[in-house]
C-alpha cells in the first residue's frame, strides 16, 4: 500500500492511496479463511471445502467488501500515523475507473483537518457574577400568587362577572343534533379562564342563578375533533349557581396547603426558590459574557466546510422562523448571508474550543446526568414516559442532542473555576434587563 500527499493548504488535505492487487487478494483470502469453517458444499464435509473452490465460488462476491475494508483500513492507518482528525467525512473517489480484477486500486482521498486549538490562560478572563437577593417585595408577590392559586369560590347574589365561577348544566347541538362530549351537569366554569371554545365564556357574563341561556359559538377550524371543526354550535345552558372568587388568607393554614410547616417556613422556601431562579439567570448572563470573551481571545483557522454547513443550517432555521406556514423543505434554496456566516464562524470556533478543552481535561457527561436529562424531557409526555425513555435509549442522535448542552455547561463551569470572577449585587429589575439584552446579541 502506498500513500502520497497531493494537497496540503491550510486545513485542506489530499492524498493518493494505492492498494496493490496482491493486498486485495490477501484480504479476499482472509475473508474466505474466516468463513471456511462454516461452509458446507456437496461432496465435502462442513469446513473442509478447498480454498481454491471457495475462491472460485465466492471470491467475486467478496471482492467489493474486501475493497471497502482495505480502503477503510488504509484511511484508519493514515489518520493514526498523521494525527489528523477530519472535520467531516473524507471524500473518497476511485481514480482508475477502468479497473478490472488483477489491477491495483487507486483512490483519491480529500478532507479538511480539524485545527490545532491553542492553549489559553483562562485566568486572564475577567467576569462579573451578578447576585440578586430575594427581597421582601418579591417574596410577598410570590405569596400573593400562591394565594390566588389557592383561592376558593363562594356563592354570590346577582350577575356573573369576569373571574367569577358559574356552575352550569349544558347541552351542545350542531345542526339541531346533540353530539358526543357536548353535555355536562354541575360543571364549574371560571369566566375568563379561556378553557371553553372561544366566545363561550363571554356570553355567560351578566347571567344569574336560575337563568337559562343559549350560547352561539363556532368550533375553531383546527379543532381536535375533526367532525366538529369549523361548525356552528348552540349550547343550551342552565346557570345553577354564581360564585365569586375569594383569595386564600396568607397565613399558616395556607402555608400548610403548600407543604410548609408555617408561613415563615414557606417564606424561606420561596426566598430559596427565587434566589435559585436569579442564580440561573445570572449564570446565563455570565456564560454569554464568557463566550464573547473567548470568541475574541482565542483565534485559529476554521474548516470552511464546517462553517458553510453551520451557516446553511442557521439560514434555514431563521427562514422557517420567518415563514412558519411552510412545512418541510418545499422551498427555494436559501443562501446564507454575511451575517449568517459570521454567526457560523463564532459557533464553530466556540464549539471546537469547548470540545477540545473538554477532551483534554476528561470532562464527561455521567450516566446519572443523562438519566436526569431524559427524565426531564419525558415529563413533557405524561403517561408515555416509559416509551419515551426506551425511544431515547435506542436513538443515538437523540442521546447526543441531550448530551451536548450538558457537556457544554460542564466545560463552561470548568472555565468559570479558572477565570477571574468578581461578584456584583444588583436588583431583580437590572438582572431582568441583562437577560433581555441576551436576545439582542449574537
UniProtKB/Swiss-Prot annotation:
GO terms for molecular function: peptidyl-prolyl cis-trans isomerase activity. InterPro entries: PPIase_dom_sf, PPIase_FKBP_dom, Trig_fac, Trigger_fac_C, Trigger_fac_C_sf, Trigger_fac_ribosome-bd_bac, Trigger_fac_ribosome-bd_sf, Trigger_fact/SurA_dom_sf. Keywords: Cell cycle, Cell division, Chaperone, Cytoplasm, Isomerase, Rotamase. PROSITE patterns: FKBP_PPIASE (PS50059). It is found in: Cytoplasm. It holds the Pfam family FKBP_C. The keyword Isomerase applies. One of its GO terms (cellular component) is cytoplasm. It catalyses: [protein]-peptidylproline (omega=180) = [protein]-peptidylproline (omega=0). Gene3D superfamilies: 3.10.50.40, Trigger factor ribosome-binding domain, Trigger factor, C-terminal domain. The keyword Repeat does not apply. Consists of 3 domains; the N-terminus binds the ribosome, the middle domain has PPIase activity, while the C-terminus has intrinsic chaperone activity on its own. Belongs to the FKBP-type PPIase family. Tig subfamily. This is Trigger factor. The lineage of its organism: Bacteria, Pseudomonadati, Pseudomonadota, Alphaproteobacteria, Rhodobacterales.
Amino acid at each position: 500500500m502506498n500513500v502520497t500527499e497531493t494537497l496540503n493548504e491550510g486545513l485542506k488535505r489530499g492524498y493518493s492511496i494505492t492498494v496493490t492487487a496482491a493486498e486485495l487478494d490477501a484480504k479476499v483470502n482472509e475473508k474466505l479463511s474466516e468463513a471456511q469453517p462454516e461452509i458446507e458444499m456437496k461432496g465435502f464435509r462442513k469446513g473442509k471445502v478447498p480454498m481454491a473452490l471457495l475462491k472460485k465460488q465466492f471470491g467475486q462476491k467478496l471482492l467489493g467488501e474486501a475493497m471497502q475494508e482495505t480502503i477503510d483500513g488504509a484511511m484508519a492507518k493514515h489518520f493514526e500515523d498523521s494525527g489528523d482528525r477530519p472535520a467531516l467525512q473524507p471524500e473518497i473517489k476511485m481514480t482508475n475507473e477502468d479497473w478490472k480484477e488483477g489491477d491495483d486500486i487507486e483512490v483519491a482521498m480529500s478532507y479538511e483537518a480539524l485545527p490545532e486549538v491553542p492553549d489559553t490562560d483562562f485566568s486572564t478572563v475577567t467576569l462579573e457574577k451578578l447576585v440578586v437577593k430575594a427581597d421582601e417585595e418579591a417574596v410577598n408577590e410570590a405569596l400573593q400568587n400562591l394565594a390566588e392559586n389557592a383561592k376558593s369560590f363562594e356563592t354570590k347574589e346577582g350577575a356573573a362577572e369576569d373571574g367569577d365561577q358559574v356552575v352550569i348544566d349544558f347541552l351542545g347541538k350542531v345542526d339541531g343534533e346533540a353530539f358526543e362530549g357536548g353535555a355536562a351537569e354541575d360543571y364549574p366554569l371560571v369566566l375568563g379562564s379561556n378553557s371553553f371554545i372561544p366566545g363561550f365564556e363571554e356570553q355567560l357574563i351578566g347571567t344569574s342563578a336560575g337563568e337559562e341561556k343559549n350560547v352561539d359559538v363556532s368550533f375553531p377550524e383546527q379543532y381536535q375533533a375533526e367532525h366538529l371543526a369549523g361548525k356552528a354550535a348552540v349550547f343550551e345552558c342552565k346557570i345553577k349557581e354564581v360564585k365569586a372568587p375569594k383569595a386564600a388568607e396568607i397565613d399558616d393554614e395556607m402555608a400548610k396547603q403548600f407543604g410548609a410547616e408555617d408561613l415563615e417556613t414557606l417564606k424561606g422556601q420561596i426566598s430559596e426558590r427565587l434566589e435559585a431562579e436569579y442564580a440561573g439567570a445570572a449564570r446565563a448572563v455570565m456564560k454569554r459574557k464568557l463566550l464573547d470573551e473567548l470568541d475574541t481571545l482565542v483565534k485559529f483557522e476554521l474548516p470552511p466546510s464546517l462553517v458553510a454547513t453551520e451557516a446553511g443550517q442557521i439560514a434555514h432555521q431563521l427562514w422557517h422562523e420567518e415563514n412558519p406556514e411552510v412545512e418541510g423543505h418545499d422551498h427555494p434554496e436559501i443562501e446564507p448571508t454575511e451575517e449568517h456566516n459570521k454567526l457560523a464562524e463564532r459557533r464553530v470556533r466556540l464549539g471546537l474550543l469547548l470540545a477540545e478543552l473538554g477532551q483534554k481535561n476528561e470532562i464527561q457527561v455521567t450516566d446519572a446526568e443523562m438519566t436526569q436529562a431524559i427524565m426531564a424531557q419525558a415529563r413533557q409526555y405524561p403517561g408515555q414516559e416509559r416509551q419515551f425513555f426506551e425511544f431515547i435509549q435506542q436513538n443515538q442522535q437523540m442521546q447526543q442532542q441531550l448530551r451536548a448542552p450538558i457537556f457544554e455547561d460542564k466545560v463552561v463551569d470548568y472555565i468559570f473555576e479558572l477565570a477571574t470572577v468578581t461578584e456584583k449585587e444588583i436588583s431583580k429589575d437590572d438582572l431582568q434587563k441583562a437577560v433581555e439584552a441576551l436576545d439582542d446579541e449574537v
